[in-house]
């Protein structure tokens, strides 16, 4: 029987192993022993990020772009391999082509987080010592920041968990590292929201830092009802790890997350004397921009422009966009109900409409247009405004 007809592969088959050993040349085929010579650099020279990340994860020979050969010597019960192409609908000639534009790996990522915390600590010390909390409107502080901004941490926590499958099933190390960091940044945002609430509890007598009230709003309230359903779907109901990662960042968070963070809390906070919440939101927006660059490289530059599967991948991503756009619009429509709880005169329909157009236009330019998804900005805004009371 020919080697192609054998069911067993590589080292699991002694006969095939003997054939392989016999075919090995006596002298090395390649005498280059420079570190990482087998990695194709994205930039002018091989970066530290690439040298320590690319091809660190072993791969079977059916994972496109890898350097290994043969099958796994160990498998899950039932014969499932450690990684398999069946975990995603997207296809490519090279799963190892993606690069994080910011070249993040473990050490610089941890360093960045440490620097952010030190800066946050200094800011909070100055804020407290200066008594700036006295300028914040108590209703805004106790109702909108405590309850509704606090409830948003569960949105970010759910999106963090939506990355768990991709962090396990990703078919290459470069993809896995990016997915993991996108997820960690989401849980970091959730922690920053609770940090703000904990800080307020220290400087405002009677302010409750417990998550009981925000959790009740997230699980039982009307403002986040459709958002909760969307997050639960992205986290628990998607088999394809690329679908969940793509839909979180290229659809849901780019629309709903951006509106909540930037166009509601960050835009309105100064009107209530709140310069504390925008400090944390600016960090969250930095994470959003970092993830956007990585998402665009992975899904548009690599998979969307794949030399063999570009048309197919774009079709799949357009289908995912259409699938998750409706739940996202529903989440925004429900969130419109929060404007009715604001004091009269805080904002008006004209400003809210302009905010929606900013978010939708950014989404179309940065995401939808990159895969030729036809989106009607006016129709989206109209559908969302139907929830404005």
Swiss-Prot record:
Stated name of the protein: Methane monooxygenase component A beta chain
Keywords noted in UniProt: Monooxygenase, NADP, One-carbon metabolism, Oxidoreductase
Keyword NADP found: yes
Stored Gene3D superfamilies: Ribonucleotide Reductase, subunit A
GO biological process: one-carbon metabolic process
Disulfide bonds: none
Pfam family, one: Phenol_Hydrox
Role summary: Responsible for the initial oxygenation of methane to methanol in methanotrophs. It also catalyzes the monohydroxylation of a variety of unactivated alkenes, alicyclic, aromatic and heterocyclic compounds.
Molecular functions (GO terms): methane monooxygenase [NAD(P)H] activity
Catalytic activity entry: methane + NADH + O2 + H(+) = methanol + NAD(+) + H2O; methane + NADPH + O2 + H(+) = methanol + NADP(+) + H2O
EC number: 1.14.13.25
Subunit and interaction comment: M.capsulatus has two forms of methane monooxygenase, a soluble and a membrane-bound type. The soluble type consists of four components (A to D): protein A, comprising three chains, in an alpha-2, beta-2, gamma-2 configuration, is a nonheme iron protein containing an unusual mu-hydroxo bridge structure at its active site and interacts with both oxygen and methane.
SUPFAM superfamilies given in the database record: Ferritin-like (SSF47240)
């Amino acid at each position: 029987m020919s080697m192609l007809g054998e069911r067993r592969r590589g080292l699991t088959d002694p006969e095939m192993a003997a054939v392989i050993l016999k075919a090995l040349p006596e002298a090395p085929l390649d005498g280059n022993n420079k570190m990482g010579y087998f990695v194709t650099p994205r930039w002018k020279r091989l970066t530290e990020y690439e040298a320590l990340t690319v091809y660190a994860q072993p791969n079977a020979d059916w994972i496109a772009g890898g350097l290994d050969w043969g099958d796994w010597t160990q498998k899950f019960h039932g014969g499932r391999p450690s990684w398999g192409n069946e975990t995603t609908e997207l296809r490519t000639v090279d799963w190892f082509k993606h690069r994080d534009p910011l070249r993040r790996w473990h050490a610089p990522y941890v360093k960045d987080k440490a620097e952010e915390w030190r800066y946050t600590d200094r800011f909070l010390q100055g804020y407290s010592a200066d008594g700036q909390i006295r300028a914040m409107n108590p209703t805004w502080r106790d109702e909108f920041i405590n309850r509704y901004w606090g409830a948003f941490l569960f949105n970010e926590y759910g999106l963090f968990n939506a990355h768990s499958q991709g962090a396990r099933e990703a078919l290459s190390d470069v993809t896995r590292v990016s997915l993991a960091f996108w997820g960690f940044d989401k849980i970091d945002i959730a922690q920053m929201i609770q940090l703000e609430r904990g800080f307020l509890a220290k400087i405002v007598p009677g302010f409750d830092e417990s998550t009981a009230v925000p959790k009740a709003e997230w699980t039982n309230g009307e403002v986040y009802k459709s958002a909760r359903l969307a997050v639960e779907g992205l986290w628990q109901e998607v088999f394809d790890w690329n679908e969940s990662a793509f839909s979180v960042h290229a659809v849901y968070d780019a629309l709903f997350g951006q509106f909540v963070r930037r166009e509601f809390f960050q835009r309105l906070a100064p009107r209530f004397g709140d310069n504390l919440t925008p400090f944390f939101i600016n960090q969250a927006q930095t994470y959003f921009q970092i993830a956007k660059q990585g998402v665009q490289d992975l899904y548009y530059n690599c998979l969307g422009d794949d030399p063999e599967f570009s048309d197919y991948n774009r079709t799949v991503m357009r289908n995912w966009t259409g699938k998750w756009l409706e739940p996202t619009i529903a989440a925004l429509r429900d969130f419109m109900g929060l404007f009715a709880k604001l004091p009269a005169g805080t904002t008006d329909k004209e400003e809210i409409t302009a905010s929606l157009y900013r978010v939708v236009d950014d989404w179309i330019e940065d995401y939808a247009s990159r895969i030729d998804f036809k989106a009607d900005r006016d129709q989206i805004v109209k559908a969302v405004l139907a929830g404005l009371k």
